[in-house]
A protein has these predicted regions:
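Extracellular mucin-like PTS domains
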Residues: 44-64
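N-terminal export and membrane-targeting signals
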Residues: 1-21
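N-terminal hydrophobic targeting segments that direct proteins to the cell envelope
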Residues: 35-44
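Glycan-processing catalytic domains of CAZymes
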Residues: 56, 64-351
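Extracellular/mature segments of secreted proteins
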Residues: 4, 37-38, 333-337
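C-terminal motif of bacterial Sec signal peptides marking the signal peptidase cleavage site
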Residues: 25-28
Length: 351
């Protein structure tokens, strides 16, 4: 998925699905899909099992970064599963830096599927580069957890080195190493060569400098399933799994939880990643009838499954749209929320 607000609404997943819908329908599975305030969110549920770890100082990244620190055993957030009145409450805002003084950005004033005022979010998923450590700290003071959105399978030239706080931008480092492949359809981004050691080093620097150093609790790794795309590099599913495991191990060594993103039409991919992954974020799995394909191993393991549905897909009134998927999500142990594809702060949660 490309970052919302960069020229196209929604996600890269939707475009992929529409092209392959007939194949998935033939398999009787439907099609898959591809991103201090006025309302203080309540403290997270005890089921989340979080043990705090201190922020890690950033280290400067050179064009050819040095060896990564050796992973060590550290505590990280283990978000519990979902269900009626259980589990974290989710806000996903990637359109712009989170404004903790904005009721919309903070997810306040939402109405749930039952037509009642929804409780405030306890988990915020925000852009790891655009948002400063002070925003993460402000959310922590409210008792909330914060997920760091980064791209691990593609790169866009969105940020300057100065905005990233490093001498040479991550995009420029990847370009200099020859690790940029074909364009991501519909977005100003290029796939990266996930089999290159230089790519791993740059992405690990991003995890360390943007997520760990700013005090985030977890990482949302976008485009973590590029084996299914035409990237310009030969990549097998097994190689993609190994890449994702390498990154999750590194994140854990820094005290960060790690999520799975995408891969919604490949249950084998989800099954392979679940043992080293702490939560799952799907997009449009209810709309495309693919939730069970990917969520089953996470639900069985008691891990959090988040389903982001989009008003652009369902096209009706919010209450009617929630009524079409929330009951199924909740009964399956999935935490569903309806967003606009711009991911600009509006949210309508199932519970």
């Amino acid at each position: 998925m490309a970052r919302p607000g960069t020229g196209g609404g929604g996600t890269r997943k939707a475009a992929i699905i529409l092209g392959g819908a007939s194949l998935l329908l033939a398999a009787a599975c439907g099609g898959p899909g591809h991103d201090s305030g006025p309302a203080a969110g309540p403290a997270p549920a005890a089921t989340q099992g979080f043990t705090a770890t201190p922020a890690i100082p950033a280290r400067p990244t050179a064009t050819a970064p040095g060896p990564r620190p050796r992973p060590t055993a550290r505590a990280w957030w283990h978000p519990g599963g979902s269900g009626p009145d259980n589990g974290p409450r989710f806000q996903w805002e990637l359109n712009h830096p989170l404004n903790t003084h904005s009721a919309r950005d903070m997810g306040a004033g939402a109405v749930n599927a039952a037509g009642r005022p929804a409780a405030g979010p306890t988990v915020y998923d925000i852009d790891g580069i655009e948002n400063p450590a002070s925003t993460v700290a402000a959310l922590h003071r409210l008792g909330d957890k914060v997920i760091c959105y980064i791209e691990v399978g593609a790169a866009g030239n969105y940020y300057s080195a100065a905005s990233e706080g490093i001498p040479v931008s991550y995009y420029s480092q990847l370009a200099a190493a020859g690790d940029l492949g074909r364009k991501v359809p519909g977005y100003p981004e290029r796939y990266v060569d996930i089999n290159a050691a230089s790519t791993v080093s740059v992405v690990e620097s991003m995890i360390r400098q943007q997520c760990a150093a700013k005090g985030f609790d977890a990482v949302e790794p976008d485009i973590d399933d590029s084996y299914s795309d035409s990237t310009g590099y030969p990549v097998t599913e097994a190689e993609n799994e190994a890449y994702d495991r390498t990154l999750s191990t590194y994140a854990h060594s820094l005290g960060l939880a790690w999520g799975q993103k995408n891969g919604d039409n490949d249950p084998a991919f989800a099954k392979a990643l679940e043992p080293t992954t702490d939560f799952l974020l799907t997009e449009e799995c209810s709309f495309y009838h693919t939730c069970q394909l990917v969520s089953a191993p996470y639900v069985r393991a008691g891990k959090l499954v988040l389903d982001a549905e989009y008003t652009d897909d369902w096209g009706g009134a919010v209450a009617a749209d929630l009524g079409r998927f929330c009951a199924a999500d909740l009964s399956a142990g999935i935490d569903g929320t309806l967003f606009t594809s711009a991911l600009a702060g509006q949210r309508s949660p199932c519970q």
